[in-house]
Protein backbone atom coordinates (compact mmCIF):
# COMPACT_ATOMS: atom_id res chain seq x y z
CA UNK A 1 0.00 0.00 0.00
CA UNK A 2 1.20 3.47 -0.89
CA UNK A 3 0.29 6.26 1.53
CA UNK A 4 0.48 9.81 0.18
CA UNK A 5 0.91 12.63 2.70
CA UNK A 6 -0.17 15.95 1.19
CA UNK A 7 -2.30 19.08 1.64
CA UNK A 8 -3.19 20.04 -1.93
CA UNK A 9 -5.90 18.12 -3.78
CA UNK A 10 -5.23 19.92 -7.05
CA UNK A 11 -1.59 18.87 -7.21
CA UNK A 12 -2.47 15.25 -6.51
CA UNK A 13 -4.93 14.80 -9.38
CA UNK A 14 -2.36 13.47 -11.92
CA UNK A 15 -1.03 11.01 -9.34
CA UNK A 16 -4.50 9.66 -8.61
CA UNK A 17 -5.10 9.09 -12.29
CA UNK A 18 -1.74 7.42 -12.91
CA UNK A 19 -1.80 5.20 -9.82
CA UNK A 20 -5.34 4.09 -10.67
CA UNK A 21 -4.32 3.23 -14.24
CA UNK A 22 -1.37 1.24 -12.86
CA UNK A 23 -3.61 -0.65 -10.45
CA UNK A 24 -1.46 0.58 -7.58
CA UNK A 25 -3.37 0.67 -4.29
CA UNK A 26 -2.96 3.98 -2.48
CA UNK A 27 -4.44 5.92 0.39
CA UNK A 28 -4.34 9.68 0.87
CA UNK A 29 -3.46 11.32 4.14
CA UNK A 30 -4.61 14.92 3.64
CA UNK A 31 -2.64 16.39 6.50
CA UNK A 32 -4.88 19.46 6.85
CA UNK A 33 -7.68 17.21 8.12
CA UNK A 34 -6.26 13.72 8.75
CA UNK A 35 -4.41 12.87 11.95
CA UNK A 36 -3.00 9.38 12.48
CA UNK A 37 -2.85 7.86 15.94
CA UNK A 38 0.76 8.44 16.97
CA UNK A 39 0.37 6.17 20.02
CA UNK A 40 0.24 3.01 17.91
CA UNK A 41 2.41 1.54 15.16
CA UNK A 42 1.79 2.97 11.69
CA UNK A 43 0.40 0.71 8.99
CA UNK A 44 2.76 -1.23 6.78
CA UNK A 45 3.47 0.34 3.43
CA UNK A 46 5.42 3.01 1.59
CA UNK A 47 4.83 6.63 2.60
CA UNK A 48 5.25 9.29 -0.09
CA UNK A 49 5.52 12.85 1.25
CA UNK A 50 4.11 15.63 -0.94
CA UNK A 51 4.14 18.38 1.70
CA UNK A 52 4.77 21.88 0.38
CA UNK A 53 6.36 25.01 1.79
CA UNK A 54 3.45 26.98 0.31
CA UNK A 55 0.82 25.16 2.43
CA UNK A 56 -0.02 28.37 4.28
CA UNK A 57 -1.23 29.98 1.05
CA UNK A 58 -4.04 27.42 0.99
CA UNK A 59 -5.04 28.06 4.61
CA UNK A 60 -2.93 25.20 5.93
CA UNK A 61 -0.55 26.98 8.31
CA UNK A 62 0.95 24.57 10.82
CA UNK A 63 0.36 21.53 8.61
CA UNK A 64 4.06 21.19 7.65
CA UNK A 65 5.01 21.22 11.34
CA UNK A 66 2.44 18.53 12.10
CA UNK A 67 3.68 16.50 9.15
CA UNK A 68 7.26 16.75 10.44
CA UNK A 69 6.13 15.09 13.66
CA UNK A 70 4.26 12.37 11.76
CA UNK A 71 7.39 11.64 9.71
CA UNK A 72 9.43 11.16 12.87
CA UNK A 73 6.77 8.66 14.02
CA UNK A 74 6.97 6.77 10.72
CA UNK A 75 10.77 6.74 10.72
CA UNK A 76 10.95 5.63 14.34
CA UNK A 77 8.94 2.57 13.39
CA UNK A 78 11.18 1.82 10.42
CA UNK A 79 8.68 2.59 7.68
CA UNK A 80 9.84 3.36 4.14
CA UNK A 81 9.37 7.12 3.71
CA UNK A 82 10.00 8.85 0.38
CA UNK A 83 11.23 12.40 1.05
CA UNK A 84 11.23 12.00 4.82
CA UNK A 85 11.99 14.37 7.67
CA UNK A 86 15.42 15.43 6.36
CA UNK A 87 13.92 16.44 3.01
CA UNK A 88 11.00 18.27 4.63
CA UNK A 89 13.39 20.21 6.87
CA UNK A 90 15.12 21.66 3.80
CA UNK A 91 11.80 22.22 2.03
CA UNK A 92 10.70 24.59 4.78
CA UNK A 93 13.74 26.87 4.86
CA UNK A 94 15.76 28.39 2.04
CA UNK A 95 18.42 29.40 4.56
CA UNK A 96 18.91 25.75 5.50
CA UNK A 97 18.83 24.79 1.81
CA UNK A 98 21.58 27.24 0.97
CA UNK A 99 23.75 26.17 3.89
CA UNK A 100 23.42 22.53 2.83
CA UNK A 101 24.27 23.38 -0.78
CA UNK A 102 27.35 25.37 0.26
CA UNK A 103 28.48 22.50 2.48
CA UNK A 104 28.67 20.47 -0.74
CA UNK A 105 30.50 23.26 -2.62
CA UNK A 106 27.48 23.92 -4.81
CA UNK A 107 27.15 27.55 -5.94
CA UNK A 108 24.65 29.79 -4.15
CA UNK A 109 24.17 33.52 -4.84
CA UNK A 110 25.14 35.93 -2.06
CA UNK A 111 22.19 35.85 0.36
CA UNK A 112 21.26 37.63 3.60
CA UNK A 113 18.36 36.88 5.95
CA UNK A 114 16.44 39.37 8.09
CA UNK A 115 13.33 39.56 10.25
CA UNK A 116 12.40 43.24 10.28
CA UNK A 117 12.03 46.10 7.77
CA UNK A 118 14.83 47.93 9.57
CA UNK A 119 17.17 44.97 9.12
CA UNK A 120 16.23 44.63 5.46
CA UNK A 121 16.84 48.32 4.84
CA UNK A 122 20.24 48.14 6.50
CA UNK A 123 21.27 45.10 4.46
CA UNK A 124 19.92 46.51 1.19
CA UNK A 125 22.13 49.62 1.42
CA UNK A 126 25.20 47.51 0.72
CA UNK A 127 23.69 44.85 -1.55
CA UNK A 128 25.19 44.47 -5.02
CA UNK A 129 22.56 45.31 -7.63
CA UNK A 130 20.35 43.98 -8.99
CA UNK A 131 19.03 41.88 -6.12
CA UNK A 132 15.80 40.08 -5.26
CA UNK A 133 13.71 39.56 -2.17
CA UNK A 134 12.45 36.08 -1.24
CA UNK A 135 10.40 34.52 1.51
CA UNK A 136 12.50 32.02 3.45
CA UNK A 137 9.61 29.55 3.51
CA UNK A 138 7.70 29.66 0.27
CA UNK A 139 6.86 27.88 -2.91
CA UNK A 140 5.73 29.19 -6.30
CA UNK A 141 8.13 32.14 -6.16
CA UNK A 142 6.29 33.82 -3.29
CA UNK A 143 7.85 37.10 -2.21
CA UNK A 144 10.30 37.20 -5.11
CA UNK A 145 10.74 40.69 -6.50
CA UNK A 146 13.66 42.22 -8.36
CA UNK A 147 15.25 45.57 -7.46
CA UNK A 148 17.82 47.40 -9.55
CA UNK A 149 18.87 49.77 -6.79
CA UNK A 150 18.47 50.72 -3.14
CA UNK A 151 16.10 53.63 -3.81
CA UNK A 152 13.59 51.37 -5.56
CA UNK A 153 13.74 48.92 -2.67
CA UNK A 154 13.24 51.64 -0.06
CA UNK A 155 10.12 52.86 -1.88
CA UNK A 156 8.66 49.33 -1.96
CA UNK A 157 9.55 48.35 1.60
CA UNK A 158 6.20 49.22 3.19
CA UNK A 159 4.32 47.35 0.46
CA UNK A 160 6.52 44.28 0.96
CA UNK A 161 5.70 44.34 4.66
CA UNK A 162 2.00 43.95 3.84
CA UNK A 163 2.63 40.35 2.71
CA UNK A 164 5.10 39.06 5.30
CA UNK A 165 6.67 35.59 5.07
CA UNK A 166 4.92 32.94 7.14
CA UNK A 167 8.04 32.31 9.26
CA UNK A 168 8.94 36.00 9.54
CA UNK A 169 12.21 35.63 7.61
CA UNK A 170 12.87 37.52 4.36
CA UNK A 171 15.92 36.99 2.18
CA UNK A 172 17.90 39.45 0.10
CA UNK A 173 19.78 37.69 -2.69
CA UNK A 174 21.99 38.88 -5.52
CA UNK A 175 20.14 38.44 -8.80
CA UNK A 176 21.88 36.21 -11.33
CA UNK A 177 21.16 37.77 -14.70
CA UNK A 178 20.69 35.57 -17.73
CA UNK A 179 21.16 36.50 -21.39
CA UNK A 180 17.81 34.81 -22.08
CA UNK A 181 14.56 34.89 -20.08
CA UNK A 182 14.53 31.29 -18.93
CA UNK A 183 16.00 29.00 -16.31
CA UNK A 184 16.62 25.27 -16.40
CA UNK A 185 15.08 23.11 -13.69
CA UNK A 186 16.49 19.60 -13.26
CA UNK A 187 14.14 16.86 -12.02
CA UNK A 188 15.37 13.91 -9.95
CA UNK A 189 13.61 10.68 -8.94
CA UNK A 190 15.26 8.18 -6.64
CA UNK A 191 18.07 10.70 -6.33
CA UNK A 192 18.90 10.31 -10.04
CA UNK A 193 18.48 12.83 -12.84
CA UNK A 194 15.47 12.09 -15.07
CA UNK A 195 14.81 15.17 -17.21
CA UNK A 196 15.16 18.95 -17.36
CA UNK A 197 12.57 21.69 -17.76
CA UNK A 198 13.15 24.96 -19.54
CA UNK A 199 11.19 27.51 -17.51
CA UNK A 200 10.08 30.79 -19.09
CA UNK A 201 10.62 33.60 -16.56
CA UNK A 202 9.60 36.49 -18.80
CA UNK A 203 6.30 36.99 -16.94
CA UNK A 204 7.72 36.89 -13.43
CA UNK A 205 8.95 34.58 -10.71
CA UNK A 206 5.77 33.01 -9.33
CA UNK A 207 6.32 29.69 -11.04
CA UNK A 208 5.17 26.20 -10.16
CA UNK A 209 5.02 23.34 -12.69
CA UNK A 210 1.94 21.86 -10.99
CA UNK A 211 0.01 25.12 -11.39
CA UNK A 212 1.35 26.74 -14.54
CA UNK A 213 2.25 23.99 -16.98
CA UNK A 214 0.65 24.58 -20.34
CA UNK A 215 0.04 21.29 -22.14
CA UNK A 216 -0.37 21.82 -25.88
CA UNK A 217 -3.53 20.56 -27.53
CA UNK A 218 -2.55 18.17 -30.31
CA UNK A 219 -5.24 19.77 -32.47
CA UNK A 220 -3.98 23.31 -31.78
CA UNK A 221 -1.83 24.41 -34.72
CA UNK A 222 -1.27 27.93 -33.39
CA UNK A 223 2.36 28.99 -33.69
CA UNK A 224 1.89 31.62 -31.01
CA UNK A 225 1.15 29.15 -28.21
CA UNK A 226 3.79 29.59 -25.50
CA UNK A 227 4.79 26.93 -23.00
CA UNK A 228 6.06 28.21 -19.67
CA UNK A 229 7.55 24.78 -18.94
CA UNK A 230 9.11 22.70 -21.70
CA UNK A 231 10.91 19.38 -21.30
CA UNK A 232 14.47 19.56 -22.63
CA UNK A 233 15.47 16.33 -24.36
CA UNK A 234 18.91 14.85 -23.65
CA UNK A 235 19.93 17.66 -21.29
CA UNK A 236 23.55 17.36 -20.13
CA UNK A 237 25.41 19.46 -17.57
CA UNK A 238 28.52 18.61 -15.52
CA UNK A 239 26.81 19.82 -12.33
CA UNK A 240 24.18 17.04 -12.43
CA UNK A 241 26.36 14.35 -10.75
CA UNK A 242 27.11 16.85 -7.99
CA UNK A 243 23.39 17.42 -7.50
CA UNK A 244 22.85 13.66 -7.31
CA UNK A 245 25.53 13.35 -4.64
CA UNK A 246 23.94 16.22 -2.71
CA UNK A 247 20.51 14.57 -2.79
CA UNK A 248 21.98 11.28 -1.59
CA UNK A 249 23.78 12.92 1.33
CA UNK A 250 20.69 14.93 2.30
CA UNK A 251 18.34 11.91 2.07
CA UNK A 252 16.20 13.53 -0.61
CA UNK A 253 14.52 11.04 -2.95
CA UNK A 254 12.50 13.26 -5.31
CA UNK A 255 13.44 16.86 -6.08
CA UNK A 256 13.49 19.63 -8.64
For each of these PLM feature ranges, what is it?
Residues 145-241, 245:
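Phosphate-binding site of ATP-dependent enzymes
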Amino acid sequence: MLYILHENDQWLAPFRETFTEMGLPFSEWHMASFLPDLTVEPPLGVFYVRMSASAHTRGHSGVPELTAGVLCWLERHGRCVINGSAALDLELSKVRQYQALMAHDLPVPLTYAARSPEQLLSLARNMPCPFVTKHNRAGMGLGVERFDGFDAFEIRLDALAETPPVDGVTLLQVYIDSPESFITRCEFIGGKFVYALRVDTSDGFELCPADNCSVPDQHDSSETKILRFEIVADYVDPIIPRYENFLHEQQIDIAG
